[in-house]
Amino acid sequence: KKIRPEGSGWGVDFAKNSVAVGSAKHGWGFTYEILLEKGLKPQDVFAKYKEGDIQWLRENLPLDEPMLRMVVDHLPNPVEASKYRIPHIWGGDLDSELGQSLQKSDPKGPLYGMITKIFLDPRRGYQATLIGRVFSGTFDHTDSVYLIGGRSTNRIKRLGVMEITDLLDIPRVPAGNLFALYGFICPSGETFMSSNDVPKNKEEAYQLPTFEKIQYACEPVVSRSIKAQDPQQIDKLTTVVSKWLQADPTAMYRLDKESGEFILSGIDPL
């Protein structure tokens, strides 16, 4: 109650299944509803945990069950969320065709979306997988997109959804859904649209509205020093680090002149 927005009814309550208890590390969890269904009490669960019987906890209280239930029961669907979200995160004309489509999360409207995260896979030479959300229109695997902040047009090579670290290909992604793609790299927080909808006039193109910049409350908390064994590999190191800086907007990269080492700092695993 102390931190919820004024005038809102936000709150959490274990008895209403808006609180889950468990362990992400060990893969188990429960809500009040799940305990009732299984005829268990919290004391039973904690006794098993104290005994170290993680296998029993995973088999009887798998973590995916309470997490999925809470998403379904408590999070608003994209259509409902867009009504109050878009006026706060998008700076364009809400009465325009695009503005109306964004507020309705309309899959038939103009394509508009945002890159929210970048995954760099060390198993594939730090290939960048861009993850984001379509807020309007339908994203097709044959589309080319215009990056409003970067002012560049890019074609995608693969479009799909992520399953852990793998991309599952799908032909199109309608508004309201998350997606993942290969083909290019850009900073997280970038707004994109269909390249076919970009105004011919450069001044108009430069003034296209973007989504609000992602705000991060954290500062870099982990640092690692890097030194190339072969000076000829400096360019390769710079290429990988530049990808990392785009993936983690909080990251910093500097040269320690005394040691000759490069210092990379960020909040993501380095």
Q: Could you tell me what each predicted segment is?
A:
Residues K1-L270:
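Structural and coupling elements of P-loop NTPases
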